[in-house]
Structure formats: C-alpha cells, structure tokens
C-alpha cells in the first residue's frame, strides 16, 4: 500500500505547528538538508542584480583631429580653450562624471565623431 500526495497533505493539515516543526527537523536530519539554505541563496542573488545609473565618460585618446575634439570638450563641459586643450592632452581623463546613460551615450557619440577614442564606465 503506497501513500498518495493527497494523503500526505491531509496528514500535514491535521498536525499542530509544533508537530510540523518536529517533522521538518527530522526530515532535515534524515536527508542531510537544511530548509534555511534555500532562503539565504535567493536573497544574495537579488542584491547582485542592481543596474548602474551613473556613468563616467572617459577620453582615452584625442585622435588625429585634435581641434574638433577640443571643441567637443568645450561644448560638453563649458571649459575654456586652455582647459579643454589640457584635458584632451591628458588622456586618459574623465570628461564628465556621474551622468545619465543617455547623456553619456550622446557625449560619446559627439567625441567619437570628432575623432576621439572614448569609453563609458
């Protein structure tokens, strides 16, 4: 005679909370498992999946068209000519930090079209 799943569920429903706790402890001991392990691993993965919201646009090289890159840096940052030139020559350097993804992509496109090498971090 084998016991069906429905019969097992009915037996659980008839038990008190203390009896269920004792049964779970006995099952953990018999099969060498722990009910708490599944809860811990699920919470750890949820914390890992977090999307980045702020980005840094980094100029890695000014390329051949240095004048166009300096103009692009000036328009994006509001720096003067001397500061923008110094920034382009100091590559790798962060042109803008803590900007949104859309703004970072637009700045990267502008600098790349001017001939610069750019990374978004």
Swiss-Prot record:
Paired cysteines (S-S): none
SUPFAM superfamilies noted in UniProt: ClpS-like, Ribosomal protein L7/12, oligomerisation (N-terminal) domain
Keywords in alphabetical order: Ribonucleoprotein, Ribosomal protein
BP GO annotations: translation
Xref: Pfam families: Ribosomal_L12 (PF00542), Ribosomal_L12_N (PF16320)
A GO cellular-component term linked to this record: cytosolic large ribosomal subunit
A GO term, aspect molecular function: structural constituent of ribosome
Matches recorded under InterPro entries: Ribosomal_bL12, Ribosomal_bL12_C, Ribosomal_bL12_C/ClpS-like, Ribosomal_bL12_oligo, Ribosomal_bL12_oligo_N_sf
Coiled coil: none
HAMAP family according to UniProt: Ribosomal_bL12 (MF_00368)
Similarity comment text for this entry: Belongs to the bacterial ribosomal protein bL12 family.
Function: Forms part of the ribosomal stalk which helps the ribosome interact with GTP-bound translation factors. Is thus essential for accurate translation.
Quaternary state and interactors: Homodimer. Part of the ribosomal stalk of the 50S ribosomal subunit. Forms a multimeric L10(L12)X complex, where L10 forms an elongated spine to which 2 to 4 L12 dimers bind in a sequential fashion. Binds GTP-bound translation factors.
Protein name: Large ribosomal subunit protein bL12
Native source organism of the sequence: Shewanella baltica (strain OS223)
Gene name, Swiss-Prot/TrEMBL: rplL
